[in-house]
């Protein structure tokens, strides 16, 4: 998701 920690850019 947009705020998924390190993967926030997904």
From Swiss-Prot:
Tissues and organs where the protein is expressed, per its UniProt entry: Expressed in the antennal lobe (at protein level).
Gene Ontology annotations of biological process type: neuropeptide signaling pathway
Domain of life: Eukaryota
Keywords for this protein: Amidation, Neuropeptide, Secreted
Sites bearing Arginine amide, chain numbering: 10
Main location: secreted
Subcellular location: Secreted
Gene Ontology cellular component list: extracellular region
Disulfide bonds: none
Signal peptide: none
Coiled coil (residue ranges): none
The protein, known as: Tachykinin-related peptide 3
